[in-house]
């Protein structure tokens, strides 16, 4: 039996972070977590990281698609925060963001890591951006690092 796995070292690999400006008080902590993870754990050089800012989570998929079309990135990490309000807007934005990012990954065959937190309250968002519940930006970066290696290992497998 052949087992294909990945590790989190990605020296020489190129990553793009697509980041929502909306709810920046939470998202900036996700960005810090992702960058720290890429550089410290993944050993990715800061020159191999591109950060793209978009207005909100709904715009993340189209920016991720444009980056994937370039063919220069090994992995893309999408970061944002969608916090439930009093209208159905939350479901539309969160759902379309999720579907769009998954479609980019499947269409272009590169990992697109989902670091968009979807919460019922501001308190939950803060918890998931670096306090009680860890940092979902760091977790998304770890997933991207591992998947970049998994994809390379699948490509090289006999």
Swiss-Prot record:
EC number: 2.5.1.78
Catalytic residue list: 89
Gene3D superfamilies: Lumazine/riboflavin synthase
The keyword Cell inner membrane belongs to this UniProt entry's keyword annotation: no
Catalysed reactions, semicolon-separated: (2S)-2-hydroxy-3-oxobutyl phosphate + 5-amino-6-(D-ribitylamino)uracil = 6,7-dimethyl-8-(1-D-ribityl)lumazine + phosphate + 2 H2O + H(+)
Annotated binding of 5-amino-6-(D-ribitylamino)uracil, by residue: 22, 57-59, 81-83, 114
InterPro entries: LS (IPR034964), LS/RS (IPR002180), LS/RS_sf (IPR036467)
An example Gene Ontology molecular-function term: 6,7-dimethyl-8-ribityllumazine synthase activity
Subunit and interaction comment: Forms an icosahedral capsid composed of 60 subunits, arranged as a dodecamer of pentamers.
Entries under HAMAP family matching the protein: Lumazine_synth (MF_00178)
The protein's name: 6,7-dimethyl-8-ribityllumazine synthase
Organism: Pseudoalteromonas atlantica (strain T6c / ATCC BAA-1087)
Phylogenetic placement of the source organism: Bacteria, Pseudomonadati, Pseudomonadota, Gammaproteobacteria, Alteromonadales
